[in-house]
UniProtKB/Swiss-Prot annotation:
NCBIfam families reported in the protein's UniProt record: nusB
UniProt function note: Involved in transcription antitermination. Required for transcription of ribosomal RNA (rRNA) genes. Binds specifically to the boxA antiterminator sequence of the ribosomal RNA (rrn) operons.
Alphabetized InterPro entries for the sequence: NusB-like_sf, NusB_fam, NusB_RsmB_TIM44
A matching Pfam family: NusB
Organism expressing this protein natively: Rhizobium meliloti (strain 1021)
GO MF assignments: RNA binding
Protein name per Swiss-Prot or TrEMBL: Transcription antitermination protein NusB
Source organism phylogeny: Bacteria, Pseudomonadati, Pseudomonadota, Alphaproteobacteria, Hyphomicrobiales
Superkingdom: Bacteria
Membership in a protein family: Belongs to the NusB family.
Keywords: RNA-binding, Transcription, Transcription antitermination, Transcription regulation
Length: 160
């Protein structure tokens, strides 16, 4: 008897990865719509994380990881933005970037700075994959390059 795809157990969703994606979406929503952090976190926890909304079921996510990223980015934005700006090419300003790219870079930079327990390659890979979910080519490369520069600046060559 052969296993068909429906006979095989489903791979467990990476709940931190889902939290990162939700955090990027929430940060984007805050940037574009001017929604406050408390309101957006409550909305995601009540209606989105692991829930069905408008016929779509959102991935189960680590809610505390989600909260940590969103609240941390909002709290530390004045520290994060100059760091991101210094990692961009000379002729690029953070304000010129797409709102989604800004959200991805802010969340990734926050994790590089604050989550020393997570290896840099994991953080960079996760946020590059998020960029690939929204963009084709240049933006994921930009996310990779900028987060890599920030990681080297903040954590040195250890890449851990």
């Amino acid at each position: 008897m052969t296993n068909t795809p429906s006979d095989q157990p489903l791979k467990q969703v990476n709940q931190r990865g889902a939290a990162r994606l939700a955090a990027v979406q929430a940060l984007y929503q805050m940037d574009v719509g001017g929604t406050g952090v408390l309101e957006i976190v409550a909305e995601y926890e009540e209606h989105r994380l692991g829930k069905e909304l408008d016929g779509d079921t959102y991935l189960r996510a680590d809610a505390s990881w989600f909260r940590s990223i969103v609240a941390g980015v909002v709290r530390d934005q004045r520290k994060l933005d100059p760091l991101i700006g210094s990692a961009l090419q000379d002729d690029w300003a953070l304000s010129r970037l797409d709102s989604t790219v800004r959200a991805i870079l802010r969340a990734g930079t926050f994790e590089i700075l604050e989550r020393k327990d997570v290896p840099v390659p994991v953080i960079v890979t996760e946020y590059v994959e998020i960029a690939k979910a929204f963009f084709q080519d240049e933006e994921p490369k930009l996310v990779n390059a900028v987060l890599d520069r920030i990681a080297k600046q903040v954590r040195g060559d250890q890449r851990k």
